[in-house]
A protein has these predicted regions:
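C-terminal accessory regions of radical SAM enzymes
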Residues: 2-13, 146-149, 329, 344-423
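Proline-aspartate-enriched helix->loop->beta-strand connector
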Residues: 64-68, 232, 358
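Glycine- and acidic-residue-enriched helix-capping/strand-helix junction motifs
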Residues: 13-27
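Radical SAM [4Fe-4S] cluster-binding motif and immediate context
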Residues: 22, 166-333, 351
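Hydrophobic/aromatic residues located in beta-strands of well-ordered beta-sheets
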Residues: 3, 96, 142-143, 235, ...
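Glycine-rich beta-alpha loop elements in corrinoid/cobalamin-binding modules
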Residues: 30-162, 365-367, 371
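Structural recognition of alpha->loop->beta junctions
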Residues: 109-126, 281-292, 348-363
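N-terminal [4Fe-4S]-dependent radical SAM core
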Residues: 4, 9-16, 142, 146-190, ...
C-alpha cells in the first residue's frame, strides 16, 4: 500500500531553519518496518520541510496515498485535527491513522476525526493494521487500536510492549531530509521505558515502566551506520534512562572503542544523578561522551519531594563535580513553577544553579500533561487556566490560589533570560 506519514509542525509559522531539531525517530521506525514488508512509504516532517497545510493538500492530491498516518503530541493536537479534516476533504478515500504520545494517552480525542487510533508503541500495530486493511479483513482483533464502528467506539485492548528491540529495523532516515537536522549530528534511541515515578512524566503511559534495552552490539551497529552513511560525527542519545543498566553502558563504551569509532556523543535527554558513578563517567568519557544533561529539576528539597525525584542535593553536587573534573560538559534540566513551588523555593533553585556553575542550563515550564499525576494534582489543588493544548510548554496552563500563573510566568522569563543564553 501507499502510505504517507506526517509529523506536524510545532509552531503555526514554520521557521526556515530548525537548528537543534531532532528527526522524528518514531515515524522513521514505523516507516522502516512497513517498507521491510514491501509497502511504499513517504515521511514529511513539517518542522523542517517548510510544508504549510496548503502545500500538504497539494501533495496529497498528487500522490493519492492509501493511508495517511499522523504522529500527535499534546501541543500539536489542534494542528493534527486540522490536518485530519483537510485530508478527509482532499482525499476522502484515504484511511487516516493517528498515533503518538497524545493519541496514546487520550485516544478518545481523535476517534471522531480519524479512522483508527494507534495506542502505545506503533511499529507492530501499524504493520498488522496495514496488512489487515490491504486484505480487506476485520481489524477488531488487532491489539492497540481504538476506532469507531457503527457509531460505537471499539477498543481492542493494549498491545504488549515490544521485548525484542533488536529485531526492529533501524529508522528509515533516508526518507528524511537528514541535512536539515544538526548537520553532522545524529540522534538514536537505545532503550525504552523508565521505572521511576516522577510526578510530571508521561513516558510510562506509552513505553511502560519496565526498562527494555537494545544490545550493545545492535546500538553500536546503528552508530557505525550513521557514521558511514551520513558522515555523523556526534551522536545524541535520546533515551529516558540510558545509564540505568551500568553493565550495558560499559559494554556499549567498549564496543565503540573496539571498533575505533572516533565519535563524540552526549546524553541529550538527560539521566539521573543517582544512576552514574565516577568510574562509569570515566569510561563514558574514554568512549567519546563529551556532554551529559542531568534531570535536576529543582534546588529545593521540598519541591524535589513533591516531584518524587528521589534524589538529594548533595548527590547532584557530587556528580556534577565528578563530571566536570573528568572533562565532560554538564547540563542541567530544571522544571520551574510546578507542584510545591513558591517564591522561596524558586530562590533556592536560583541559588543552586549559581552554585553548580553548569555549562548548560535548560529551564522548562512546569507542564501538567494529561493523565499524569501532575495533571491530577492540578485538578485537586488548583485550576487550569486554559484548555488550549497549543499553549502547553509555552506558558503556564494552570495556577493555584496562592501562586497565579502570571507570576509563575514572570519568574520563569527572568530565570530563562538569566541562565539559558547558552542552550
Amino acid at each position: 500500500m501507499k502510505i504517507l506519514l506526517l509529523y506536524p509542525p510545532y509552531t503555526s509559522h514554520i521557521e526556515e531553519e530548525k537548528k537543534g531539531y531532532f528527526p522524528p525517530l518514531g515515524l522513521a521506525y514505523i516507516a522502516a518496518i512497513l517498507r521491510s514488508h514491501n509497502h511504499s512509504v513517504r515521511i514529511i516532517d513539517m518542522n523542517v520541510e517548510t510544508k504549510n497545510l496548503e502545500e500538504l493538500e497539494k501533495i496529497c492530491e498528487k500522490e493519492q496515498p492509501d493511508i495517511v498516518g499522523i504522529s500527535s503530541t499534546t501541543i500539536t493536537y489542534n494542528t493534527c485535527i486540522n490536518i485530519l479534516k483537510r485530508i478527509k476533504n482532499v482525499i476522502p478515500s484515504a484511511i487516516r491513522i493517528v498515533g503518538g504520545p497524545h493519541a496514546s494517552i487520550l485516544p478518545q480525542e481523535f476517534v471522531d476525526y480519524s479512522d483508527f487510533v494507534v495506542v502505545g508503541e506503533g511499529e507492530y500495530t501499524m504493520l498488522e493494521l496495514v496488512k489487515t486493511l490491504e486484505n480487506g479483513e476485520n481489524p477488531s482483533n488487532i491489539e492497540g487500536l481504538v476506532f469507531k464502528k457503527d457509531g460505537k467506539t471499539v477498543e481492542t485492548g493494549p498491545r504488549p510492549l515490544i521485548t525484542g528491540l533488536d529485531n526492529l529495523p533501524f529508522p528509515a532516515r533516508d526518507l528524511l531530509p537528514m541535512e536539515a537536522y544538526n548537520d553532522n549530528k545524529g540522534a538514536i534511541l537505545t532503550s525504552r521505558g523508565c521505572p521511576f515515578n516522577c510526578i510530571f512524566c508521561n513516558s510510562h503511559l506509552i513505553f511502560g515502566k519496565k526498562f527494555r534495552a537494545r544490545s550493545p552490539k545492535n546500538v553500536v551497529d546503528e552508530i557505525e551506520h550513521l557514521v558511514k552513511k551520513y558522515n555523523v560525527q556526534v551522536i545524541r542519545i535520546l533515551d529516558d534512562m540510558f545509564t540505568l543498566n551500568r553493565k550495558r553502558v560499559i559494554e556499549i563504551c567498549d564496543e565503540i572503542l573496539n571498533r575505533g569509532l572516533n565519535i563524540g556523543w552526549e546524553l541529550t535527554n538527560g539521566t539521573r544523578v543517582d544512576k552514574v558513578d565516577k568510574e562509569l563517567l570515566e569510561k563514558m568519557h574514554e568512549a567519546g561522551c563529551y556532554r551529559i544533561y542531568y534531570g535536576i529539576e529543582s534546588g529545593s528539597k521540598k519541591v524535589l519531594k513533591m516531584l518524587r525525584k528521589d534524589i538529594k542535593l548533595d548527590q547532584v553536587r557530587r556528580v556534577v563535580k565528578w563530571t566536570k573534573e573528568i572533562g565532560i560538559e554538564v547540563g542541567g534540566f530544571f522544571m520551574i513553577g510546578g507542584p510545591g513551588e513558591t517564591i522561596e523555593t524558586l530562590k533556592e533553585t536560583e541559588k543552586f544553579i549559581e552554585e553548580l556553575n553548569l555549562d548548560y542550563v535548560h529551564l522548562s515550564i512546569a507542564t501538567p500533561y494529561p493523565r499524569t499525576d501532575f495533571w491530577n494534582w492540578v485538578l485537586k489543588n488548583g485550576r487550569f487556566v486554559t484548555n488550549d493544548y497549543s499553549k502547553f510548554e509555552k506558558e503556564f496552563v494552570f495556577e493555584t490560589p496562592d501562586f497565579p500563573w502570571e507570576q509563575r510566568m514572570k519568574i520563569f522569563e527572568y530565570l530563562h533570560e538569566k541562565y539559558c543564553f547558552n542552550e
